[in-house]
C-alpha cells in the first residue's frame, strides 16, 4: 500500500499438463502468437473499444490497493476477459455471422435487382414525364388556377356589427 515507484509485471504460469493446446494456436511460440500476419480490423471499426485493464480499471495516485490485490485483479481481469470472449464467440459468432450474411446478401440483391433498375427506369422516363407534365400544367392547371383566382379576387367581405 502506498506510492509504488516501479510497475508490477503480471505473469500467469500454467503447467503443460493442465493446459489444453486444442485451440489451434501454439502459445508456446510467442512469435506466432504476436504476429499472426492477419489484421482482423484493417479499417479500425473498433478502435474506440478499450478492453485493456488500464483502460477499464484505474486507481488514482492518492488511493492504491495492496500490490497483491492489484496483481491478482489484473490477472483475473485478463483471464476472465479471454475465457469469456472465447466462450461467447464460440456460441454467438457463427450464428450472428450467418444472420449478418443473410441480411447483407438480401439487401445487396434488393439493391442490385430491384432498387437500382427502378431508379434508372425513373430517371430514363423523367424527361418525357416532365414534358407531359409541363403541357398538362400549361393547358389545364394554369388556366384553371387563373380563373379561380380571378373569381375569388372579386369577392369582398364586409363585417358589420349589429
Curated annotation (Swiss-Prot):
Keyword Nucleus appears in the UniProt entry: yes
A GO-annotated cellular component: plasma membrane raft
UniProt KW keywords: Cell membrane, Cytoplasm, Golgi apparatus, Membrane, Nucleus, Phosphoprotein
Membrane topology, as annotated: Peripheral membrane protein
Main location class: nucleus
UniProt PTM comment: Phosphorylated on serine and tyrosine residues. CAV1 promotes phosphorylation on Ser-23 which then targets the complex to the plasma membrane, lipid rafts and caveolae. Phosphorylation on Ser-36 appears to modulate mitosis in endothelial cells. Phosphorylation on both Tyr-19 and Tyr-27 is required for insulin-induced 'Ser-727' phosphorylation of STAT3 and its activation. Phosphorylation on Tyr-19 is required for insulin-induced phosphorylation of MAPK1 and DNA binding of STAT3. Tyrosine phosphorylation is induced by both EGF and insulin (By. similarity).
Modified residues (Phosphoserine): 20, 23, 36
MF terms (GO), sorted A to Z: D1 dopamine receptor binding; molecular adaptor activity; protein kinase binding
InterPro entries: Caveolin, Caveolin_CS
Cytoplasmic side: 1-86, 108-162
The keyword Cell inner membrane is annotated on this UniProt entry: no
Segments dipping into the membrane without crossing: 87-107
Biological processes per GO annotation: caveola assembly; endoplasmic reticulum organization; insulin receptor signaling pathway; mitochondrion organization; negative regulation of endothelial cell proliferation; positive regulation of dopamine receptor signaling pathway; regulation of cytosolic calcium ion concentration; skeletal muscle fiber development
Chain coiled-coil ranges: none
Chain positions with Phosphotyrosine modification: 19, 27
Subcellular location: Nucleus; Cytoplasm; Golgi apparatus membrane; Cell membrane
Record function comment: May act as a scaffolding protein within caveolar membranes. Interacts directly with G-protein alpha subunits and can functionally regulate their activity. Acts as an accessory protein in conjunction with CAV1 in targeting to lipid rafts and driving caveolae formation. The Ser-36 phosphorylated form has a role in modulating mitosis in endothelial cells. Positive regulator of cellular mitogenesis of the MAPK signaling pathway. Required for the insulin-stimulated nuclear translocation and activation of MAPK1 and STAT3, and the subsequent regulation of cell cycle progression.
Similarity section: Belongs to the caveolin family.
Quaternary structure note: Monomer or homodimer. Interacts with CAV1; the interaction forms a stable heterooligomeric complex that is required for targeting to lipid rafts and for caveolae formation. Tyrosine phosphorylated forms do not form heterooligomers with the Tyr-19-phosphorylated form existing as a monomer or dimer, and the Tyr-27-form as a monomer only. Interacts (tyrosine phosphorylated form) with the SH2 domain-containing proteins, RASA1, NCK1 and SRC. Interacts (tyrosine phosphorylated form) with INSR, the interaction (Tyr-27-phosphorylated form) is increased on insulin stimulation.
UniProt-recorded name of the protein: Caveolin-2
Gene: CAV2
Amino acid at each position: 500500500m502506498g506510492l509504488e515507484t516501479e510497475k508490477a509485471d503480471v505473469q500467469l504460469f500454467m503447467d503443460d499438463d493442465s493446459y489444453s493446446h486444442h485451440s489451434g494456436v501454439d502459445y508456446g511460440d510467442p512469435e506466432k502468437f504476436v504476429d499472426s500476419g492477419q489484421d482482423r480490423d484493417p479499417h479500425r471499426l473498433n478502435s474506440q473499444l478499450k478492453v485493456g485493464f488500464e483502460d477499464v480499471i484505474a486507481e488514482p495516485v492518492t488511493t492504491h490497493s495492496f500490490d497483491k490485490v492489484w496483481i491478482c485483479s489484473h490477472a483475473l481481469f485478463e483471464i476472465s476477459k479471454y475465457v469469456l470472449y472465447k466462450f461467447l464467440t464460440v456460441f454467438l459468432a457463427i450464428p450472428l455471422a450467418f444472420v449478418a450474411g443473410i441480411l447483407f446478401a438480401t439487401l445487396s440483391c434488393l439493391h442490385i435487382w430491384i432498387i437500382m433498375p427502378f431508379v434508372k427506369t425513373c430517371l430514363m422516363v423523367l424527361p418525357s414525364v416532365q414534358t407531359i407534365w409541363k403541357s398538362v400544367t400549361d393547358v389545364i392547371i394554369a388556366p384553371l388556377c387563373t380563373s379561380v383566382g380571378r373569381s375569388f379576387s372579386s369577392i369582398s367581405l364586409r363585417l358589420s356589427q349589429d
